[in-house]
Structures are given as C-alpha cells and as structure tokens.
C-alpha cells in the first residue's frame, strides 16, 4: 500500500512539474514575443528620429530647392503664381462669388457674399460631396460631369436673394489642390495626380475647359474666371483679414505651402511687375525630397505601391492621407512576428491598405483614459484585434506618437526653410518683423497633438526671441474663400499689369 501511495505521489509531483514547466515555457515564449514587439517599436523610433540638427538640414535643403525653383523653369519645387498686389485690394469688391474646392476624396462648393471696403464677408455657405472611388481612377469626362451635377444642385437650392440678374453669369473661382499649371486665369493644366486620383486622360488637359464643358451640358450658367492653387487661396483668405499673413500651409489629405516673395528674387520671372513688387509663390512642397528625410522601409514600401511612386515623398510622410497607412504597416509587421501576442486569428484585417485612416490614428493618439479604451475600441472595430492588453494598447499609442511626431516636426522644418528663404529666420536689431502663417486643412484643425507638436517644434528651432514674432492662425475654409475672393479681384489683376 505504501508503494502505491509513494508511486502516486511521484506521478503527481511529476505532473505538477510538467504543468509548471509548460507555464514557465509559455511565459518565456510570451515574454520573447513581447520583446520582439518592443524591438520593432525601438527600431522604428530610431529610424524616425528628427533631432533639431536633422530638421535644420531638411530646412536648408528646402531653401536650396526654393532657390533652384525660382531660378529656372527646370526647378520642380517652386512656381510663380499670382501677383501679390491683387490681395491688398480684395476688400473693395461687392457681390456674390462662388468657389469650387477640389483635390481630395471630397469636394466643396462655396458661396461668398462680399460687402465691399467696409462690409467684409457678409455671408458664406458651402455644400460638400464625396467623390466615388470609381471616379478617382476613371475618365475626365465622368469626373467633371459628376462635379457639374453637384454644382447645379447647389445653385438650384440657393435663396432668391442670391439669384443673378438676367444676362449676368455666376462667377466661379476654381480652387485646385492637385499640382497644376494654374496661372490665375481661366485656364490651367494638371501636372500630375495625387491624393488617390489617377485619371490619365486629364493630365495635360485644360481642366477649366473640361469643367466649363460639363457645366454647359448641365445648362448651368456659370463662368470659371480664376484657377487658383490651394495655398494661394489660403494666403488670400488669410490676407483678407490679417495684412501680416506672408505664408500659407495646407495640412489636410495632402499638403502644400505658399509664401510672398520679392519679384527681384525671382530670376525666371520675365512678366510685368505688379505695383506691390511682390508675388505669391506656390511651392508644391509635397513633392520635396531630400537625403536628409528620415525614410523607413515602411515609407519605401508605401511609395512603391502607390499610384505615383517616387513622387510626393514629403507629402507621403506628413499628410492626412498617409499617416494612418504608415501606422497600419508597422502594426502589420508587429502582427506578422507576434501573432499570438496580438490575440489575432488572422492577419487579413491588417492586410487592407488604408483601412486605418488618420482620423482613427488621431482618436487613438488623443486617448487619455486610464485603460486606453479608445485605442482598444479602434483596434477591435477596424482591425478586428480584440481583447488587447493594456501594454499592447500602450505600444500602439507609442507608434501613433512616433508617426505623428515625425510628420509634424518635418512640417516645422519646411516652414523654417520658407522663413530662411524670406530672411525671417534670425532676430533683427530693433525687433523682428511680424510674420503670420495661415494654416488650413483637416489635419491641422482636428489633430491637436500634431498641431501642437508642429508649432512647438518651430519655436524650438527659431529660439525664444524670434518665435514671438511668428504667429500661426487657423484660416478656416481659407483656401475656398480665398478662391472666391481672388475671383472677385480678377479684373483688378488686369489693371495691376497695365
């Protein structure tokens, strides 16, 4: 009997040891997987570093590109647009003007009523419509037919007080967020598509002519009399209320910048000189690239698989269309190596490109709850990653911060490059000139962490003394309103050239 008891005890002890060994082994494997996840995070963080010294290198490279772009037509980053003198006279106009805001997955139509010199903007309203994905990769005719139809709906619903008298056409400022040869006239061609568009038959075509044709087919009595770039529109909209606006930056689905330059500093400009002696420069800075940009394997893969590989590199690192996608790619790498750690049955939910949008990333980044509830909900609802631990959510939050911080600090470097080109990057005796930067776009407006990082980074780069003279203002709907304002001043543009 004793032998049986002893034998049973031995067997029981062995079983306990075996279970304990399995538990220890499981914990070791789990610990090992967590270690790999953290290693991926640390590696990504290291490659995304944007020390002040690196940002100053990026700013210097931006300035060099700006000089090159202004020197000859071969420069790709800067192109001369509308004379600055038109903006100072915007307040003189009376009447109702329209603007079409096109360049992302949505487009807007605006109606602006101006009250003249003392009246300012009396009334403004807009309607927004989504562009079906099929039209973003279809034909030019199909896209502009859809836009004209939405324009017609907007006009049909307007109040009687906005109706034009017989014989007078409604006048439209066409605000285009796509890189184009916009000449502040009633013509212009698309240089290349960005922001998810890929319509081959529209490249090189007169987009104003295409829109005009579509409006005629809809029997819409409206004339396009100004083709305006997004940042030029934002600068005009900001200048309407603040005379010190000298720079405009768009941070939305895409990104771009414009600034005020002296005509003498534009060697390639051979046209008439406006009375102000200044011009607005559209930079197309989304297409900026430099060896100093902290690119990672995730950025290279995103670029290679995009509709426009090797183009818009700066935009792909800093704009609302791509930030969430960069995060998704890093999470996919984590999941591939640490599948059990993420409690996932399949990687399929992470395989869909752009399934994780930047607004989702922003919501997670702004989560301050003790258990990071929003992060957990987003992972479950969008990526089908359920039952995540707190440390998993913290890892995701850290990745959000890395992606956003890199983008915001690179934007700050871009602004520093502009200020450097304008000679406003160093303190002046007697006090520095006040410079107002008009900002527009959903990324800047809604992603608070991104906005604060950008502004604080620029302050650090400039130094405390100079930073007090640089002011950021949110020019809400500035680009679209600016397009309407520039349309209103079109006749003055001709007078300035006389």
From Swiss-Prot:
It is found in: Plastid, Chloroplast outer membrane. It comes from the Eukaryota. GO terms for biological process: glucose 6-phosphate metabolic process; glucose metabolic process; glycolytic process; intracellular glucose homeostasis. PROSITE patterns: HEXOKINASE_2. The keyword Transport does not apply. Its EC number is 2.7.1.1. It holds the Pfam family Hexokinase_2. Fructose and glucose phosphorylating enzyme. May be involved in the phosphorylation of glucose during the export from plastids to cytosol. Seems neither to be involved in cell sugar sensing nor in carbohydrate metabolism in tuber. Belongs to the hexokinase family. This is Hexokinase-1. It comes from Solanum tuberosum (Potato).
């Amino acid at each position: 009997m004793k032998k049986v008891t002893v034998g049973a005890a031995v067997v029981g002890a062995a079983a306990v040891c075996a279970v304990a060994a399995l538990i220890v082994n499981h914990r070791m494997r789990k610990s090992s997987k967590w270690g790999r996840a953290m290693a991926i995070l640390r590696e990504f963080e290291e490659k995304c570093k944007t020390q002040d010294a690196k940002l100053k290198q990026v700013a210097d490279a931006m300035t060099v590109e700006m000089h090159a772009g202004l020197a000859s037509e071969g420069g790709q980053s800067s192109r001369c647009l509308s004379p600055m003198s038109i903006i100072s006279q915007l307040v003189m106009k009376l009447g109702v003007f329209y603007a079409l805001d096109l360049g992302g997955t949505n487009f807007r139509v605006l109606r602006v009523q101006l009250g003249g010199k003392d009246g300012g903007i009396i009334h403004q309203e807009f309607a927004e419509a989504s562009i079906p994905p099929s039209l973003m990769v279809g034909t030019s005719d199909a896209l502009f037919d859809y836009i004209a139809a939405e324009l017609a709906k907007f006009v049909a619903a307007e109040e009687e007080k906005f109706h034009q008298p017989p014989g007078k056409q409604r006048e439209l400022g066409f605000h285009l967020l796509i890189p184009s040869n916009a000449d502040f006239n009633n013509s212009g061609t698309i240089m290349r598509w960005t922001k998810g568009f890929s319509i081959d038959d529209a490249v090189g075509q007169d987009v104003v002519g295409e829109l005009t044709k579509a409006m005629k087919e809809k029997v819409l009595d409206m004339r396009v009399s100004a083709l305006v770039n997004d940042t030029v529109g934002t600068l005009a909209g900001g200048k309407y209320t603040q005379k010190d606006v000298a720079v405009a930056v768009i941070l939305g689905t895409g990104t771009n910048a414009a600034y005020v330059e002296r005509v003498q500093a534009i060697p390639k400009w051979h046209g008439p000189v406006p009375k102000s002696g200044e011009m607005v420069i559209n930079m197309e800075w989304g297409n900026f690239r430099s060896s100093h940009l902290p690119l990672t394997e995730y950025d290279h893969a995103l670029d290679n698989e995009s509709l426009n590989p090797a183009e818009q590199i700066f935009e792909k690192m800093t704009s609302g269309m791509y930030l969430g996608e960069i995060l998704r790619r890093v999470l996919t790498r984590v999941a591939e190596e640490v599948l059990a750690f993420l409690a996932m049955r399949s990687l399929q939910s992470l395989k869909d490109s752009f399934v994780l949008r930047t607004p989702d990333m922003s919501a997670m980044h702004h989560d301050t709850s003790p258990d990071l509830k929003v992060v957990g909900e987003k992972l479950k609802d969008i990526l089908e990653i359920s039952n995540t631990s707190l440390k998993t959510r913290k890892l995701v939050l850290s990745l959000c911060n890395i992606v956003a911080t890199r983008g915001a600090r690179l934007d700050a470097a871009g602004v520093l490059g502009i200020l450097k080109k304008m000679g406003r990057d160093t303190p002046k005796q007697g006090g520095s000139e006040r410079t107002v930067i008009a900002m527009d776009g959903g990324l800047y407006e809604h992603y608070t962490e991104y906005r604060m990082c950008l502004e604080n980074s620029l302050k650090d780069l400039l130094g405390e003394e100079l930073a007090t003279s640089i002011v950021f203002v949110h020019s809400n709907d500035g680009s679209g309103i600016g397009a309407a304002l520039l349309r209103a001043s079109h006749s003055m543009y001709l007078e300035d050239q006389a």
